[in-house]
């Protein structure tokens, strides 16, 4: 806050009110009074005292001029990574800022940042389910995972590797060296339960400290059996840390009786809510699924806006992205459902 003095502030012998000094963060001024040899008549001194008290009261009651106070406020830029495809799944490129419309909690927002095929650094965690139902396919997961890592990582990107069964175990911390991920993939080991939601929760927190895009790629047949973390808790952590989830659902080859349909649905909705995507994998199809994840990450639009006209008291702000001119073209637009804010973000 900046306090400026105008007009009366320059008067010699001005009286500083307690209120003005407190607002500006300044100590009261004390002026040295010179003793005059010839004392004023008692009536003159009384008149001066009354005038001084009146002036002090006037200054104390006088509101500070608006132009004399400056407030500075930080406003958060909300970043949305958006994928657009047609009804056949083909990627739609060549769109411009003017093609998109963004709203938050039903209130229109102005797009301040726009980029095609964002070159922001990519921070990705590969999380592999090694519970008993999928551990038998670990050789396929290891080989396909290595090819995915070597094809995806660029000089500015980083990747980490975790496995989850009865518990979550980090095999490789964030690195830009594919060989380190390879060595981690060679150390996969099995377990009994499936701590799926624990893996999402912990991976989201780890990714939350990174700049750029944050992506969690899950390879699982679906279904959390550890029951330490709930679906809602896992999803909230992903949204709080702006993590996009890509679910690669490795369903059993056997009949549908061996499938966890509820768990598969959870993987699908986690991807939808965070702006990612889900893929079903048939026998030997992991390479194709990884390739589609890589393509999806390389064909994103980045939209950014500074929130305005927010509804007070909201913790979660829901966003909506549309392409008005595409109303009749059945475009599929994917982006995260919204974002959490510990306190309302003020607009300008």
Mark where each language-model region is.
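Bacterial N-terminal signal peptides
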Residues: 47-60
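Ser/Thr/Pro/Gly-rich low-complexity, intrinsically disordered segments
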Residues: 1, 7-10, 19
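Scaffold/interface architecture of coatomer-like assemblies
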Residues: 64-348
């Amino acid at each position: 806050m900046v306090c400026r003095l105008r007009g009366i502030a320059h008067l010699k012998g001005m009286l500083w009110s307690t209120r003005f000094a407190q607002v500006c963060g300044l100590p009261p001024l004390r002026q040295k009074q010179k003793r005059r040899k010839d004392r004023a008549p008692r009536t003159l001194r009384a008149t001066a005292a009354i005038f001084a008290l009146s002036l002090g009261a006037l200054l104390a009651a006088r509101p500070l001029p608006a132009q004399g106070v400056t407030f500075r406020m930080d406003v958060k830029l909300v970043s949305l990574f958006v994928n657009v495809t047609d009804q056949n799944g083909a990627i739609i490129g060549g769109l411009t800022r003017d093609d998109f419309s963004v709203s938050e909690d039903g209130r229109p927002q102005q797009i301040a940042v726009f980029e095609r095929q964002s070159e922001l650094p990519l921070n990705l965690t590969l999380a592999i389910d090694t519970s008993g139902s999928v551990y038998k396919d670990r050789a396929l997961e290891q080989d396909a995972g290595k090819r995915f890592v070597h094809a995806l990582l660029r000089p500015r990107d980083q990747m980490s590797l975790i496995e989850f069964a009865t518990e979550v175990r980090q095999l490789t911390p964030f690195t830009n060296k594919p060989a380190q991920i390879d060595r981690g993939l060679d150390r996969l080991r099995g377990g009994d339960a499936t701590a799926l939601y624990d893996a999402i929760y912990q991976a989201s927190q780890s990714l939350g400290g990174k700049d750029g895009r944050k992506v969690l790629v899950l390879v699982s047949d679906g279904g959390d059996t550890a029951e330490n973390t709930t679906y809602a808790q896992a999803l909230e952590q992903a949204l709080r840390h702006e993590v996009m989830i890509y679910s690669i659902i490795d369903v059993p080859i056997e009949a549908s009786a061996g499938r966890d349909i509820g768990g598969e649905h959870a993987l699908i909705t986690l991807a939808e809510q965070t702006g990612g995507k889900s893929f079903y994998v048939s026998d030997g199809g992991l390479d194709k699924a990884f390739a589609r994840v890589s393509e999806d990450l390389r064909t994103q639009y980045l939209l950014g806006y500074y929130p305005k006209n927010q509804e007070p008291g909201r913790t979660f702000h829901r966003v909506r992205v549309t392409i008005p001119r595409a109303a009749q073209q059945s475009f599929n637009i994917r982006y995260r459902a919204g974002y959490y804010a510990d306190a309302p973000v003020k607009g300008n």
